[in-house]
């Protein structure tokens, strides 16, 4: 299974639950940047299921005929993440344009970066990032390790890292909500089991795990 980095905690739990319902089945995940995973799929990597962090990335896979029709299964929004206690005294999105602040955002070619670009455009803010990361977990790590004063990451990532970061919402986030699609890949060597996993993700049990992690309805 190839899945967006922001799905790490939720899908790991779903994988364990799925395995318990299917004795003898082992689920192996490759979590990372949706864009990187899509490239791997397009190059023929042996993957059964792809869950992307936005429809545009999934479209690059379906456009080359590598996936069955996808189903949207959750949504996610950005939050401002700061180290515990907010030592940089970040108050809102405007601080991302303050060159005296250390800022991390996702690179523009990955879904969390594309969402960030929409947010900044809506807020009429030109960000001044100190680092552009290739996936949301790498961006979050900059906050967890106190390397930056703030970052834009998904709400679910703030929840997953609640022991090391604080997060807060901002109005423009809803204008850049990401919808996540999932699909069985046409080259799957385990198509039946792959479809069963997708069905489990879409089931009440799978959706309960995703809601607990902070994901919204698609």
Please report, for each region that a protein language model flagged, where it lies by residue.
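Exported/periplasmic ABC-transporter solute-binding proteins
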Residues: 1-21, 26, 35, 39-42, ...
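N-terminal glycine-rich flavin-associated loop
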Residues: 79
């Amino acid at each position: 299974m190839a899945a967006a980095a922001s799905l790490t905690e939720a899908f790991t739990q779903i994988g364990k639950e799925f395995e318990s319902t299917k004795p003898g089945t082992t689920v192996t995940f490759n979590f990372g940047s949706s864009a990187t995973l899509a490239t791997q799929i397009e190059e023929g990597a042996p993957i059964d299921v792809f869950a992307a962090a936005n429809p545009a990335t999934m479209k690059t896979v379906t456009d080359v005929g590598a996936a069955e029709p996808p189903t949207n299964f959750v949504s996610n929004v950005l939050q401002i993440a700061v180290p515990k206690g907010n030592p940089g005294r970040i108050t809102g999105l405007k601080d991302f344009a303050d060159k005296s602040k250390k800022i991390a955002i996702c690179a523009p070619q990955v879904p969390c970066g594309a969402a960030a670009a929409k947010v900044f455009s809506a807020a009429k803010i030109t960000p001044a990032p100190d680092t552009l990361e290739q996936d949301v977990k790498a961006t979050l790590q900059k906050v967890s390790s106190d390397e930056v004063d703030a970052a834009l990451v998904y709400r679910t990532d703030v929840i997953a890292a609640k022991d090391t970061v604080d997060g807060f919402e901002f109005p423009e986030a809803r204008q850049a909500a990401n919808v996540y699609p999932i699909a069985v890949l046409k080259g799957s060597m385990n198509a039946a089991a792959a479809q069963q996993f997708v069905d489990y993700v879409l089931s009440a049990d799978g959706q309960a795990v995703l809601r607990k992690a902070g994901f919204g309805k698609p």
